[in-house]
């Protein structure tokens, strides 16, 4: 893996990181969590997460695993741009509410460097959902990397949508506007940027991620998952 240096060592080899930061991890030990959410709208204070996904990557961008679930929301109202995200009320009927997924989602995010395309959008909606459960999501912007921002500095001028970035990098994007499809596409875009050597050295972000205080979770990683992936339900009306 080739990384762009962010905090070079001093002339005598000492690590000139800010005081108090945890020791930097070995590069090969870094793990990335690529996140995406589909929502009922744009304002996290007013709208809800309908689907969430995480793709875990190794330090070199190789996929290690993935997780996704639909999320039930209260009421019988509209679900936003259903024509775009394809989620219907009947699809959500077997899905758990966010409070039942929060522990499982936390287990897939904690300790990782968080990656997303327009990352602030995903993080703001997740923070709002955690808050509705009485939980505080740590400030993941401090341990996050936005692929749209990388595209702005690393690709020729042009659109910076996820689909446009995939096209510019020769990456497949077969399931756009599904949480898992977009997370997979973002992961592939990020892996391409890793190979290009344009990703700022993530070791400091990884050290901060390891030190974050996450909500306590009662979810047992050896127990059954309560996630309901999109592919396990019919679309219905």
Place the predicted regions along the sequence by residue.
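Short secondary-structure boundary/hinge segments and terminal tails
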Residues: 100, 148, 183-184
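Acidic, divalent-metal-coordinating active-site segment for phosphoryl/phosphodiester hydrolysis
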Residues: 178-192
């Amino acid at each position: 893996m080739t990384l762009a240096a962010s905090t070079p060592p001093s002339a005598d080899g000492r690590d000139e990181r800010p005081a108090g930061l945890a020791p930097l991890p070995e590069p090969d030990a870094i793990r990335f969590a690529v996140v995406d959410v589909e929502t009922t709208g744009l304002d996290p204070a007013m709208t809800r997460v309908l689907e969430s996904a995480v793709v875990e990557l190794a330090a070199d961008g190789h996929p290690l695993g993935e997780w996704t679930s639909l999320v039930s929301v209260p009421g019988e109202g509209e679900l936003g741009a259903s024509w775009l995200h394809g989620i219907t009320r009947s699809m959500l009927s077997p899905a758990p509410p966010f409070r039942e997924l929060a522990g499982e989602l936390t287990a897939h995010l904690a300790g990782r460097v968080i990656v997303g395309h327009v990352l602030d959008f995903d993080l703001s909606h997740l923070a709002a959902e955690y808050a509705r459960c009485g939980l505080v999501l740590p400030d993941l912007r401090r341990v996050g990397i936005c692929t749209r921002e990388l595209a702005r500095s690393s690709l020729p001028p042009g659109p910076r949508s996820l689909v446009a970035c995939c096209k510019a990098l020769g990456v497949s994007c077969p399931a756009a506007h599904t949480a898992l499809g977009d997370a997979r596409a973002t992961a592939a875009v990020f892996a391409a940027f890793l190979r290009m050597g344009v990703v700022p050295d993530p070791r400091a972000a990884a050290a901060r991620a390891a030190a974050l205080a996450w909500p306590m979770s009662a979810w047992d990683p050896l127990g059954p998952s309560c996630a309901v992936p999109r592919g396990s339900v019919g679309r219905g009306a």
